[in-house]
């Protein structure tokens, strides 16, 4: 799959969207050559170049090397998402269909040189979900080392691309908030103190990513990056207005994503202390994890909402496939139980 993505994304394989490739690679090329970010050297895709530049310098900073690196990162993200599906879903037929859909759909649609969506805005979705699920399964989520690695991953995702990184950070924070909701009811102080800690950690993660980016830019000979510049283009309404289109009419894919997202969020709160007041509620955290997938999907979909070209809905492909697979697996399990009973 990595090879397939590499061939399809090769700047030599097609002349379609080469300007997009130039726009994406230019920032990396500048960083590799030590050019700091400034008003004349900026970009709307985030500070991914600061992460890619050291790797490219190590293995060779040419275009071909860059394409291979992006293909490898993309393949790793797909494998991470496949790991989540294989571990969450018990029915083998659903597993096979979900993993196949995960790979084939994106690869078949990816016919031009356009890194800005896949893998740029989907890369950390698979990686962060896989790491969180690993922690949930192994019960590592509150281990100090696990949390430190998690925060580092989230900071890197924010530096890579702010508009998706902040969604991933909020989604992971949502897991810990939901876990508190499962443990405590409204009358218990732990609900509020622990939630406050999570919110402060969320703010600290974003602030940490900003400070690290600013320091690196200063070390490269530039100025410290302002918070407005760091989160661009989210504070620039003209950028979004320029790229706004009409939504598709009728029953379309984004409604399916929205339905499953709201379903899994509703499910986790229905099975919480806020609803039942039951202190002996099941300690399983898989429904909380699925709520994280849902939050991530709905948050990522804001990219599509602001740029409603149909192909941009690919940004929620990972999360939507996971939600549909888990829902289908749940339905099959219940059908088999009712049939056996």
Regions picked out by a protein language model, each given a short descriptive name:
Residues 8-49, 58-73, 80, 100, ...:
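Transmembrane catalytic cores of multi-pass membrane glycosyltransferases
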Residues 96-108, 293-298, 323, 327:
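Transmembrane and membrane-interface helices of multi-pass
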Residues 2-7:
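Short, small-residue-biased leader/transition segments that mark boundaries at the very start
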Residues 146-162, 168-173, 198, 296-303:
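Membrane-interface alpha helices of multi-pass inner-membrane proteins
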Residues 98-99, 125-126, 134-157, 186-194, ...:
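Short hydrophobic alpha-helices at membrane interfaces in multi-pass membrane enzymes
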Residues 120-140, 152-153, 173-179, 319-323:
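Specific aromatic-rich, kink-prone transmembrane helix
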Residues 167, 305-339:
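Hydrophobic/aromatic-rich transmembrane helices and adjacent perimembrane loops
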Residues 81-109, 141-146, 227-229:
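Transmembrane-helix signature of polytopic, membrane-embedded enzymes
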